[in-house]
């Protein structure tokens, strides 16, 4: 088991974390399923964007870490699912 897992993704659409393939999604799910704390690292362009395969749920992340260019309305929407940290 891991203490913390940090991953990226191709898109976040509502509570779905997406990537381009089943294989990539399954491989990213392994460390997430085995971590005590889960963090998603994405730039602000990934919000409201979907890709082929939903591999994880945003509710299962302790926080999303993103840049400070995120639109305030988008930030407010996604804070309903988890903590959003801007840097």
Name each model-derived stretch.
Residues 1-87:
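Conserved phosphate- and dinucleotide-binding cores of soluble alpha/beta proteins
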């Amino acid at each position: 088991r891991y203490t913390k897992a940090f991953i990226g993704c191709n898109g976040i659409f509502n509570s779905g974390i997406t990537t381009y393939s089943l294989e990539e999604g399954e491989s990213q799910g392994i460390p997430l399923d085995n971590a005590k704390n889960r963090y998603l690292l994405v730039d602000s362009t990934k919000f409201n964007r979907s890709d082929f395969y939903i591999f994880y749920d945003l509710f299962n992340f302790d926080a999303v870490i993103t840049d400070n260019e995120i639109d305030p309305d988008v930030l407010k929407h996604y804070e309903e699912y988890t903590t959003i940290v801007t840097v």
